[in-house]
């Protein structure tokens, strides 16, 4: 899988390791938040999807997949997004999320980065 083939709203299975501290770790699904122009560089801005993330859920930095119609379950933890080389990490595409769910995630990212 080439990183430039990733589309905003795609879900991939990928290893997030190595990590440090309280970063979400392990092999898990991630949601691509970056647009196709950014992804052309071979990397993508992604947010991990987890069954945990209780702090982020309470704080409002996570978006649940419940009721979205996706096979992937859990919550997109926007507060832990990072840029990854999808090809180097052998990412496997699983599915894509509906536009309204992607919009919710992008709104959370905007809230995090607003000044």
Predicted segments with their positions:
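Conserved functional hotspots at enzyme active or ligand-binding sites that engage polyanionic ligands
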Residues: 1-115
């Amino acid at each position: 899988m080439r990183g430039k083939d990733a589309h905003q709203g795609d879900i991939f299975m990928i290893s997030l390791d190595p990590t440090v501290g309280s970063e979400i770790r392990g092999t898990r699904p991630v949601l691509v938040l970056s647009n196709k122009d950014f992804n052309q560089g071979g990397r993508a801005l992604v947010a991990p999807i987890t069954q945990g993330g209780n702090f982020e859920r309470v704080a409002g930095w996570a978006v649940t997949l419940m009721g979205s119609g996706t096979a992937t379950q859990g919550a997109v933890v926007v507060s832990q997004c990072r840029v990854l080389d999808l090809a180097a990490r052998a990412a496997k595409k699983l599915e894509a999320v509906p536009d309204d769910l992607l919009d919710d995630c992008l709104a959370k990212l905007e809230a995090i980065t607003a000044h």
